[in-house]
Each structure stands twice: as C-alpha cells, then as structure tokens.
Amino acid sequence: MTEIRTDDIGFGNLKLLQDPSEFCYGVDAVILADFAASICGGYRYAADLGTGTGVIPFILHHKAGSGDSRYFGLDFNEGSIGLARESSRLNGLCEQIHFGCGDIAELAGCASAKAFAEDGVWQGAMENGGFDVVTSNPPYFAKGSAIPAEGAGKFRARHETTADLDGFLQAAAKILKRRGQLFLVHRPSRLVDIFESCRRCRLEPKTIRFVVPEAGQAPNIVLIHCVLGGGRELKYLPQLAVYDGRGSYSREIQKIYERI
C-alpha cells in the first residue's frame, strides 16, 4: 500500500495530502487558481469540478477568499475526496472548504442541480441562485485518444472517461448563477472544441491567456475565463512563460507561487 504524503505547498503554509501512486497536481492547477483570483477578485460561493485532492480550492481560497467565502470540490474518486477532506481538516478550513464525491457526467445530466448534493455549501449556493465562480482542470485528452499505459487513477485524471469536455461545461453552466464566472485550464489543441462547447452552454469566453514552457516557444497550456450569458468580446492577456530559459521558474511563476 502506498504511503500517503503530506506536502507543504506554501500559500500561507497550506498542507496537501497526496497519494504518489495517483495523479498529483502540477503547475497548471496553480496557475489556474492564480488566473481565477486575478479576475474574479473574490467570491461568496465557488465550486471546483474534477477537484482531485483539492489543490485549486485551497490556493484560490488563500488568494481570493474572505471570511464568508465557501468552496465545494467535486470528484468521482473517493480516495482523492477522502484526502481532500483530511487536508481541509489539517488546514483548519473544514467550514470554508467542503468536498463531495460525485460524477460530473451525472451532474451534467441531472434534472435538478440543487438535488445533486446535500452538502451545506452546495445547498447554500443553490439557494443563492448558483455558484459565483466555477473552476476546472478537466482531463485533457478526449475519449479514445490514447491507450491506458499507466495506473487507473492517473489515466482517469488525464483522459476523459465518464464526463467529456461537453459534460464538464454543461455541469458548470448548470450550477453557475447568471453572470457567474468559469475558469478553465486546458490544452491549446482542444481550443476549437472548447469554444464550440462553451457557446452551446451559453458560456461566453471573455479572457484567454496562453502559457508557454519558455519565451518564444509554442503554447502548451491555455487559461480561459467565461461568463454565463456574457456578451461577445474576447480579451487576450500576454503569454505566461513557465521557465526562464535557464531551467528555473520564471519571475512571474515565482510570484504566482508566492516565493518572491
């Protein structure tokens, strides 16, 4: 049995429990949380779809949450949700950040979003007209695009299984309040699919930022901000370089990680 790891991830001395044999978060989750914080400014109710062990809710709450902010993380992996709940306890955030086990595909197809979860944060958001903010770092690879060559947990985190891209966006639109904001991280190769799905779900892309490994290279990550029922105008932010060309994190990434 794999020994569970307790990582000190920074951001106000946050701790995160992770199983090394399962999928562990990467830089894309961190930059998504920072991207959301820089645009949303704050929130009353937020949800993270496909939350894994909960790193995005913890970081975004640190960067943009307030005393009355509440976050709900949803994932279909019971083991990951168990670790996320324990991390919430370790960080003294049990009241502010809740986690629940459920399938995004079922949420996308359910008749009543309010009835999907009995959790207090979920019910509070639904009674408030929906979530103010939804974040998601969904699987990047479409169904049938690759042969499983890794552990089941890692494969499910990277490849669409039950819920596809449409399912994640339908679920987000279902639980957002009118003019609520979605923040998504994905691969540029899926950008056309993302925009088509967003428009079908009334999620209007408003802000986009490409992420490159180093300055001058092609982007391998894209950050997208959408507004439910928003007007048609798309703003491009300057590219974000992860590395500085010498193998170290760029100055902006170090600022995002709050190391400088």
Model-derived features: positions:
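SAM-dependent Rossmann-like transferase core, predominantly class I methyltransferases
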Residues: I4-Y45, L49-K63, H225, A241
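Short, structurally constrained coil/turn elements
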Residues: G10, G65, L93, R199-R202, ...
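General small-molecule cofactor/ligand-binding pocket signal
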Residues: L17, H98-G100, K206-R209
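Conserved Class I SAM-dependent methyltransferase catalytic core
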Residues: S21, T162-P219
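Residue-level signal for inorganic ion chemistry
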Residues: L32, N137, F168, C226
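Conserved SAM/SAH cofactor-binding pocket of Class I
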Residues: D34-I147
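Mobile active-site "lid"/loop adjacent to the S-adenosyl-L-methionine
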Residues: P138-G167
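SAM/dcSAM-binding transferase cores
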Residues: Q217-I260
